[in-house]
Amino acid sequence: MKINLVLAPEQPVSELLTLQSDQPQNVFYLGKISQLAGTNLLIIDAQNVVAKFARPIGFESRAVIGQFKGNVIHQIAFQAKDNNDELIAKLLTGNAIMAQNDNGKSEYMIWSFWSTHDELALFLASEIYQQMHALMKNPYTTTYQHVTDQSQLSLTTKMRDFDKEWWG
């Protein structure tokens, strides 16, 4: 399965939302949930969509679990040595995809899909996640909301980094 990640797409928001609504199982418009607000586009097995972008980052799937649906998408970028990538793939749970960068190096991404922030928080506190994290070299995480409406990208939307009501 071919996966592409487009960082900070240059197309208008309306065009990105249309691409997503036309192919909801393949295109995910992602809005970062942090002060470093920005958007990315995750494209799964839709080369016709990838062709519309100048700088997609290509990946090949190594493990696929469940379905790609949810309001919260958690991304982990990491490197792996030896056969740690295979061990990490065996620990995947829920709705997730693990992919290796097309450049042939030991650079990987995991995208996991969650209905709520509470579900993601439970996973991040789990023993399985701790085991996965211990096998990763230089892990870097980003959490996104699944953007379905232009209003989610408004500058008037409250940043949630320090919102105790949001994070609990």
Question: For each of these PLM feature ranges, what is it?
Answer:
Residues 1-97, 101-104, 121-122, 139-168:
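Short S/T/G/P-rich N-terminal loop/turn motif that feeds into the first structured element of a domain
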Residues 79, 111-113:
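Short hydrophobic/aromatic beta-strand micro-patches
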Residues 105-109:
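Short, surface-exposed coil-to-beta transition loops
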Residues 115-117:
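Short loop-to-helix capping motifs
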Residues 125:
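Helical (often loop-to-helix) elements that flank the catalytic cores of nucleotide-handling enzymes
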Residues 129-134:
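A common structural junction motif
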